Structures are given as structure tokens and as C-alpha cells.
């Protein structure tokens, strides 16, 4: 039986939601992840230090006994985020980054940034104090095709931010295109990217060919196979610029299976197991540990986890649903088999 032991991984991009759903999302991600960067797009969003810290307390209250799981908090940037707020957040010791959501780009992004110039003072403060800048890299102009929104964002917006703030550490999150891979690869060492398991394992054919499969619908949307292969090559390349970020984003079953379904795929039930499948598919299991356990903390200037987990190649059946507060979520690979499991 094939087994691999790796340093305990972290998730550098996850949605834990809030309220009754929190106990279920925290249960799943804390099984073997040491830390997770927790997205702030709540209702209302975590736009200030106090809101982010009270959210931290709610998450910690749901961590199962015996788990050392630690949430790493993120400030939600708005047009009005001040340099002083950035300094307060950094001084808290628990908020490690601030997040750009272009207004309307994804779930609960209506409070997001309408003009990048509005956050330049905040970005200057972040560069000064060493706070990371996390980016949902899509334009929101309705005239831009949804499959092109990441590429256009990189060309028109991100390239300018990188030039204007050369000392700012930037994470282009959940990248989905060869364009993003190339940009991050060629940029300075201050630019990195997260890649999801579902963008490594799937492309838009899985979502659209032979019937619409709404649980694959996420933002940024799945792209064509050539982009999927570029992501796999980047993740398995050994480059320190790419690391694990699930973007696990639960929605109730009836919110996904609807005439106008929500964007987001749930992978926290089997995150590292799905990544193991992806890396095995390109004969790169030897590169999984760096991607999952080293590159993220190294980029964030945080210590690597000290303990390990062991993955065993032992297929198991994924339940059709998992509990999500007072409803259910349909996970990726629901009712099917995953080849790996954590011992």
C-alpha cells in the first residue's frame, strides 16, 4: 500500500462562513490543516480590525478538542479602508493580510473596491508594515467575457499594482489560467499564487459537457484543459511561488442546484486527498509537500508546521452530502471515490 508522510499542510485560502455553518466548516478543515487564511467576505464583511478579531474568536470556539488549528485572519478592503486601520490590523498579531475584492466579483463582494486608486493609501501602509495583499484577480466589467476576466485583470490592473508597489507582498489567489502562471513566474519574488484542488483536477468540460454540473461552478470559473495543464505544471514545478489554497466555499445544496446557482465548490472534506490525486496524475507526489506545507508559510514569513500527517492510497466513498449548519452541502466528488485518505 502506497503511503506518503508530509509536514502538516496549511490552507492559504478558505471560506468558513459564519453562524450555524461554522462548526461544520471548522470541523472539516481542522482535521489535518495546521492553519488557514480565512476569507472575510461575510455578511456584513470583516472591514475593520474589531470585526475580524471577533470572527477569529467565533472560529476558535468551534475548533474541536485536541486540534491545534489556528485561523489566520484577513481584512476586507473597501474604498474607505484607512492606513490607520491597516496598522491596527497588523498590530493585532492575528490579522496577516488584507483582501481585494473588486466590487461584484464574487460572493458577498458588493462592499468591495470600486476604483483601485481608492485603496492606494492602504496599500502604501501595507507595504510599510509588511502586511500581505491578497487579490481576487478578475475584472467585473460586464462587457468582458467571463473566461477572460482573469487575464484582463492581470494585464490592466495587477501589472500596475506590482509596478507601483514593488515591496508589497502580493498573492494572486485561486489562479485559473496559463496567463496567471506566466505572470507570477516572471514577476518578482514578492508575487505568489494559490491554486485550488478543483482547478488542478477539472476543467470547463467537466462542468458543461454532457449536462450542467452546478457543483463545479465557482469563481474564477473553470477554464479549458490547456489552462488546467498549465496549473498542474506550475504546482508540480517545485517553484516556491505556488502553494495550496483550497478556496473551499460551501453553499447549501438548494442554493447550488437552482435556476441561478451560487458560485463556490466545497473541498474542505478532502482537501489534501484531492491534491494528492492531482500531483499523482503528473507523477509529482514528491513535490506535494513543498506545495502544501512549505511554500505558503515561507512566503508569509511564518514557521513551517513541526508535525506530520500520513496519506495512504486507499480509496473511499465520498458521502452525497455533508452537514452545513441547518442544511447540507454537496462536496466535490459527492457519491464518488477519492483515491487517497489521511491515516
From Swiss-Prot:
<feature type="binding site">
    <location>
        <position position="263"/>
    </location>
    <ligand>
        <name>substrate</name>
    </ligand>
</feature>
<comment type="subunit">
    <text>Homodimer.</text>
</comment>
<dbReference type="GO" id="GO:0004151">
    <property type="term" value="F:dihydroorotase activity"/>
</dbReference>
<feature type="binding site">
    <location>
        <position position="174"/>
    </location>
    <ligand>
        <name>Zn(2+) 2</name>
    </ligand>
</feature>
<dbReference type="Pfam" id="PF01979">
    <property type="entry name" value="Amidohydro_1"/>
</dbReference>
<dbReference type="GO" id="GO:0006207">
    <property type="term" value="P:'de novo' pyrimidine nucleobase biosynthetic process"/>
</dbReference>
<dbReference type="InterPro" id="IPR032466">
    <property type="entry name" value="Metal_Hydrolase"/>
</dbReference>
<feature type="binding site">
    <location>
        <position position="136"/>
    </location>
    <ligand>
        <name>Zn(2+) 2</name>
    </ligand>
</feature>
<feature type="modified residue" description="N6-carboxylysine">
    <location>
        <position position="99"/>
    </location>
</feature>
<comment type="pathway">
    <text>Pyrimidine metabolism; UMP biosynthesis via de novo pathway; (S)-dihydroorotate from bicarbonate: step 3/3.</text>
</comment>
<feature type="binding site">
    <location>
        <position position="251"/>
    </location>
    <ligand>
        <name>substrate</name>
    </ligand>
</feature>
<feature type="binding site">
    <location>
        <begin position="15"/>
        <end position="17"/>
    </location>
    <ligand>
        <name>substrate</name>
    </ligand>
</feature>
<keyword id="KW-0862">Zinc</keyword>
<dbReference type="InterPro" id="IPR006680">
    <property type="entry name" value="Amidohydro-rel"/>
</dbReference>
<feature type="binding site" description="via carbamate group">
    <location>
        <position position="99"/>
    </location>
    <ligand>
        <name>Zn(2+) 1</name>
    </ligand>
</feature>
<keyword id="KW-0378">Hydrolase</keyword>
<dbReference type="GO" id="GO:0008270">
    <property type="term" value="F:zinc ion binding"/>
</dbReference>
<comment type="similarity">
    <text>Belongs to the metallo-dependent hydrolases superfamily. DHOase family. Class II DHOase subfamily.</text>
</comment>
<dbReference type="GO" id="GO:0044205">
    <property type="term" value="P:'de novo' UMP biosynthetic process"/>
</dbReference>
<feature type="binding site">
    <location>
        <position position="41"/>
    </location>
    <ligand>
        <name>substrate</name>
    </ligand>
</feature>
<feature type="binding site">
    <location>
        <position position="219"/>
    </location>
    <ligand>
        <name>substrate</name>
    </ligand>
</feature>
<keyword id="KW-0479">Metal-binding</keyword>
<feature type="binding site" description="via carbamate group">
    <location>
        <position position="99"/>
    </location>
    <ligand>
        <name>Zn(2+) 2</name>
    </ligand>
</feature>
<dbReference type="InterPro" id="IPR002195">
    <property type="entry name" value="Dihydroorotase_CS"/>
</dbReference>
<feature type="binding site">
    <location>
        <position position="247"/>
    </location>
    <ligand>
        <name>Zn(2+) 1</name>
    </ligand>
</feature>
<dbReference type="GO" id="GO:0005829">
    <property type="term" value="C:cytosol"/>
</dbReference>
<keyword id="KW-0665">Pyrimidine biosynthesis</keyword>
<protein>
    <recommendedName>
        <fullName>Dihydroorotase</fullName>
        <ecNumber>3.5.2.3</ecNumber>
    </recommendedName>
</protein>
<comment type="function">
    <text>Catalyzes the reversible cyclization of carbamoyl aspartate to dihydroorotate.</text>
</comment>
<feature type="active site">
    <location>
        <position position="247"/>
    </location>
</feature>
<dbReference type="InterPro" id="IPR004721">
    <property type="entry name" value="DHOdimr"/>
</dbReference>
<feature type="binding site">
    <location>
        <position position="15"/>
    </location>
    <ligand>
        <name>Zn(2+) 1</name>
    </ligand>
</feature>
<feature type="binding site">
    <location>
        <position position="136"/>
    </location>
    <ligand>
        <name>substrate</name>
    </ligand>
</feature>
<feature type="binding site">
    <location>
        <position position="13"/>
    </location>
    <ligand>
        <name>Zn(2+) 1</name>
    </ligand>
</feature>
Amino acid at each position: 500500500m502506497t503511503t506518503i508522510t508530509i509536514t502538516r499542510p496549511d490552507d492559504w485560502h478558505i471560506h468558513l462562513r459564519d453562524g450555524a455553518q461554522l462548526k461544520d466548516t471548522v470541523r472539516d478543515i481542522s482535521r489535518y490543516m495546521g492553519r488557514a487564511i480565512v476569507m472575510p467576505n461575510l455578511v456584513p464583511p470583516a472591514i475593520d480590525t474589531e470585526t475580524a478579531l471577533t470572527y477569529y474568536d467565533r472560529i476558535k470556539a468551534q475548533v474541536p478538542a485536541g486540534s491545534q488549528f489556528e485561523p489566520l485572519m484577513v481584512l476586507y478592503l473597501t474604498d474607505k479602508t484607512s492606513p490607520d486601520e491597516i496598522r491596527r490590523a497588523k498590530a493585532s498579531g492575528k490579522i496577516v493580510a488584507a483582501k481585494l475584492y473588486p466590487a461584484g466579483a464574487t460572493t458577498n463582494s458588493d462592499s468591495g473596491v470600486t476604483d483601485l486608486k481608492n485603496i492606494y493609501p492602504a496599500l502604501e501602509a501595507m507595504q510599510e508594515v509588511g502586511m500581505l495583499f491578497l487579490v481576487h484577480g478578475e475584472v467585473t466589467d460586464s462587457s468582458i467575457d467571463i473566461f477572460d476576466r482573469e487575464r484582463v485583470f492581470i494585464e490592466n490592473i495587477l501589472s500596475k499594482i506590482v509596478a507601483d508597489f514593488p515591496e508589497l507582498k502580493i498573492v494572486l489567489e485561486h489562479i485559473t489560467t496559463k496567463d496567471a502562471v506566466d505572470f507570477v513566474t516572471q514577476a518578482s519574488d514578492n508575487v505568489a499564487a494559490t491554486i485550488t484542488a478543483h482547478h488542478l483536477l477539472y476543467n470547463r468540460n467537466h462542468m458543461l459537457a454532457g449536462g450542467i454540473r452546478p457543483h463545479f461552478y465557482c469563481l474564477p470559473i473553470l477554464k479549458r484543459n490547456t489552462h488546467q495543464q498549465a496549473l498542474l505544471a506550475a504546482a508540480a514545478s517545485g517553484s516556491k511561488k505556488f502553494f495550496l489554497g483550497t478556496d473551499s466555499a460551501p453553499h447549501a445544496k438548494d442554493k447550488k442546484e437552482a435556476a441561478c446557482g451560487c458560485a463556490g465548490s466545497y473541498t474542505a472534506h478532502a482537501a489534501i486527498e484531492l491534491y494528492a490525486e492531482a500531483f499523482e496524475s503528473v507523477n509529482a507526489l514528491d513535490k506535494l509537500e513543498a506545495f502544501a506545507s512549505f511554500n505558503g508559510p515561507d512566503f508569509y514569513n511564518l514557521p513551517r508546521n513541526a508535525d506530520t500527517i500520513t496519506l495512504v492510497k486507499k480509496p473511499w466513498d465520498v458521502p452525497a452530502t455533508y452537514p452545513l449548519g441547518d442544511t447540507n452541502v454537496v462536496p466535490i466528488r459527492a457519491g464518488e471515490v477519492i483515491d487517497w485518505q489521511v491515516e
